[in-house]
């Protein structure tokens, strides 16, 4: 019984103030996938998504960044992580081959509903991946999230804490 009282006292010795209760979390990583834009014509047509990152994790060089990525960039990231890290990489939302067939009654992979579903799936994917401590050390993840252009000829390596 005495142990319980001591434990309770230890918990209430420091009163919480408003800054503690409503201040920013000690460590955070927020990634939003938004603002899909379809560009190009014919077979050269594709959709890009805005990737916005806000973080205070010291491993990231930028505390806020915005880049645009297409589905094939997510595929590249996934294959790099599978090849170079010990992280179990979640699946991407499906490729939607049937939506690419000609003579469909809708816009196929450029249909607004499909793009919205894919956007949500890509956001879930990147948040799961980037939230993994081992993945946060991979250079390919940092390039994907924060570099305007992905250097696909990079040398795979780990990021060291700043």
Curated annotation (Swiss-Prot):
The covalently linked position for Glycyl lysine isopeptide (Lys-Gly) (interchain with G-Cter in SUMO2), per the record, is 95
Keyword Metal-binding appears in the UniProt entry: no
User: Where is it mostly found?
Assistant: other
Cite the effect that the entry attributes to residue 75 to A. Answer: Increases VPS35 binding
Q: What is this protein called?
A: Sorting nexin-3
- Copy the domain comment: The PX domain mediates specific binding to phosphatidylinositol 3-phosphate (PtdIns(P3)).
Lineage top rank: taxon: Eukaryota
Summarize subunit and interaction data from the UniProt record for this chain. Interacts with VPS26A, VPS29 and VPS35; the interaction with VPS35 is direct. The association with the retromer CSC subcomplex subunits is proposed to represent a functional distinct retromer variant described as SNX3-retromer complex. Interacts with USP10 and SCNN1A. Interacts with TRFC. Interacts with SNX8; 2 molecules of SNX8 seems to associate with one molecule of SNX3. Interacts with PTPRU. Interacts with MON2 and DOP1B.
The PTM entry states:
Ubiquitinated, leading to its proteasomal degradation. Deubiquitinated by USP10.
Matching entries from PANTHER family are given as: RE52028P, SORTING NEXIN-3
Q: What is the effect of changing residue 50 to K?
A: Loss of VPS35 binding
Q: Where in the cell is it found?
A: Early endosome; Cytoplasmic vesicle, Phagosome
Q: Which SMART domains match?
A: PX (SM00312)
Q: Listed disulfide bonds for this chain?
A: none
- Report domain PX positions: 27-151
Organism classification:
Eukaryota, Metazoa, Chordata, Craniata, Vertebrata
Which terms under GO biological process does the entry name? endocytic recycling; host-mediated suppression of symbiont invasion; intralumenal vesicle formation; late endosome to Golgi transport; membrane invagination; negative regulation of early endosome to late endosome transport; negative regulation of phagocytosis; negative regulation of protein catabolic process
Q: What disease is associated with this protein?
A: A chromosomal aberration involving SNX3 has been found in patients with syndromic microphthalmia. Translocation t(6;13)(q21;q12).
Q: Phosphoserine-modified residues are where?
A: 72
Function according to Swiss-Prot or TrEMBL: Phosphoinositide-binding protein required for multivesicular body formation. Specifically binds phosphatidylinositol 3-phosphate (PtdIns(P3)). Can also bind phosphatidylinositol 4-phosphate (PtdIns(P4)), phosphatidylinositol 5-phosphate (PtdIns(P5)) and phosphatidylinositol 3,5-biphosphate (PtdIns(3,5)P2). Plays a role in protein transport between cellular compartments. Together with RAB7A facilitates endosome membrane association of the retromer cargo-selective subcomplex (CSC/VPS).
Residues annotated as binding a 1,2-diacyl-sn-glycero-3-phospho-(1D-myo-inositol-3-phosphate) are 70, 72, 95, 118
Effect annotated for changing residue 156 to A: Decreases VPS35 binding
